[in-house]
């Protein structure tokens, strides 16, 4: 049906109409004008929150321009590094072009990592570790930059579902990741956004099965520590309900393979940039200073090859 789907730029939200009544949804925080959050806005937030450097993610909803990403880094070379975007859905039918674009992102524009959304299931149910993806991966892994992978729940399952099928789907995606890492075991790899915590919420706690930690037998795999954007509408600051999960991640993965992230500006729907630091640095009293130093910057610096200075 025609629901007149549209963007309310001034209010920074999407709007649609059903039976004469307008509905809206905020995915960006509601204070963004024209749905924009550029490099200057991020630097301002970083200055206020005491964040010295950021790794810029890419995603279809954020635009797909390596040229723009590179320009942000050029303007603020001491503040930004950037992932390169990949049009994953085009790999099936336009493999050579996607490979060419990726090579250009790294070799011409000088971007620092690769972002891959493992959600090609919108095109085909083929697993993303091999088959039609093999030529792409052969090139991607040869570029000698870290690869950041956003895992899905598998074909036909939404990431926000809290169901056994969602849990099973995610565990199967981890098996695909492990197969991929067997082939590219020397590639520095990181899982973005942490685990799909919503699928494993049980009352006021998160119950992660031991199987989610199996991929980390590969010492080259790390994971983002990113809670507010994923569960900030379920638990309140300082998110004490997730503290046992953070502790378990440190025990099973290691602080030297955990890196703090936020999904700015999306996470500002739930807390401030400073609070996304504070809930770990001020309230996770089970973390020693060495662990905090690694999670809050040391691990990311190592992955990106930054100097300790």
Task: Annotate each predicted stretch with a short phrase.
Residues 66-67, 95-99, 130, 202-205, ...:
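Conserved strand-to-helix beginnings and helix N-cap segments that scaffold or border functional pockets
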Residues 112-113, 125-259:
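Catalytic pocket-lining loop regions of alpha/beta-barrel enzymes
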Residues 2-53, 247-248, 252-259, 267-309:
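Mid-to-C-terminal alpha-helical segments outside catalytic/metal-binding sites
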Residues 1-135, 139, 143:
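Mid-domain alpha/beta scaffold segments of enzyme catalytic cores
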Residues 69-74, 78, 207-214, 245-251, ...:
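Short, electropositive alpha-helical surface patch
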Residues 60, 86-88, 118-120, 153-155, ...:
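Active-site-proximal loop/turn and secondary-structure-junction residues that shape catalytic pockets
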